[in-house]
Amino acid sequence: MDELIDEDATGLAERLRAREFTQAELVETFIRRIEVMNPALNFMTNSAFDRARSKADTIPLDAPFAGVPILMKDMIDIGGLPRTDGSRFMLKNVPERSVEYVEAVEAAGFNILGQTNVPEMASFIITNNDVFGATKNPWNPDYSVFSSSGGSAVAVAAGVVPMAHGTDGAGSNRLPPSATGIFGMKPSRRRMRSGEADGRHDVAKTNQMLSRTVRDSALAFSLTESLSGDPFPPVGHITGPSDRRLKVGLIVDDGKLIATDPEVSEAQRKVALLLENLGHEVEETPWPVDANEMADAYAKFFGGKVGALKTAVEAASGKPLMESGLLTRFLASNIESSAAISPEDIAKGRTFLDELVPVFADVFRKYDVLLAPVAPVVAPPLYEHTPDELFSDELSQYVAARLKFTSPINFAGCPAMSVPLSWSADLGIPIGSHFIAAEGQDRLLYELAYELEEARPWRNIWAPFSLKYVPV
């Protein structure tokens, strides 16, 4: 174990400013961590070690994170580094410019060491692809950590880095943190700096760091949020809990697609009791979205996005999509299936998703916060399904069932977080609690997260396959 393993990014930055070690020395420590843990857990796609070494001692010590190394999810443009999205089709893709969000990350004083594993183009619920392989859960390597920020979550949970970047378009900053025992935040839509090459904001996807501590996440949030005031004024740096007591709506199951595992339900009920002991008011309430209708609408939405990808892959290969060899069988067959969806049905799907905004706005006229499972299951077995399978209605339902509590939140534009407050006795895997607030109420969630972190600390609860127990 290296002596810095228990430090979060904020603590490391303080020690860098105190000159206990140099930025270059810290880079070498983190590189050794990667070299020890990645062969066992497979969380990396690309390394940027030489880039990080060259930048190390050029980062100002008065920058908030002062040169602390991090990893970025392999689904965002970083100038000069490969961006593969976990796909053969993207292996030669090297963006020339960093997007605005990445520029803010580096201005905050982070030093990028490399990129983390994802399912191909975030198209499946298990972090696995046919280029880099499957990412294993450090709590139980026979299991996955969901997706798509799986590599980043594993790197943090294994103690390799105190923070790693994630994107969340359907649950990706909540599902992997739930299964790895770390903190994951999905900010409100358009809250953060743009992560898109055109400078716009995706309708569903947003960016934020995954972390062991709330204070790391809150500081990173303040340094990468949009300062434009459109559509929300900046939140700023949130440093602790609020005295405000909240009215919380509790959901443990919705009766659709798949029943919530008893361990997951019981975990949320115990967290509800914790909230009541802290003075919050909790009552059970129905989940406001029909999971079957959501699954249908999301499939239609996906169908409206993939036509250009099909054209590009066929042009690059000179072959029909299924024969191109550039996409996994799962994604290619999913795209082919989606091609049959009519423009009228795509429009109907988008209308359903757009209507989630008023649906959740109505819910938050009654409640300050919703508490729900992150997923109805603890975690999927590592190879329960693989990228070489053909898309089917069964697989579509499998994915939709595991996204049913997270994906509607992206289209509603609400902030949400996974907080590590429970563990599975059967599997030894963490079970996150999913807190959701009204659009723009990111501060409220951070204040609640600080309170929960104080009431039930998780920072020093380590995975068995982590650097806490592995010599470096």
Question: Can you annotate each of these PLM segments?
Answer:
Residues 5, 79-82, 206, 229-303, ...:
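Gly/Ser-rich, acidic/histidine-flanked active-site/gating loops
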Residues 19, 67, 161, 340-472:
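Glycine-rich, small-residue loops and helix-cap segments
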Residues 23-27, 57, 260-287, 310-321, ...:
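Acyltransferase
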Residues 30, 52, 217, 248, ...:
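Residue-level signal for inorganic ion chemistry
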Residues 65-88, 242-251, 303-361, 373, ...:
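Short helix-loop capping/hinge segments that flank enzyme active sites or metal/cofactor-binding pockets
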Residues 97-224, 410-423, 429-432:
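Short glycine/serine-rich loop segments
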Residues 186-272, 456-472:
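A short helix-breaking turn/cap at a secondary-structure junction
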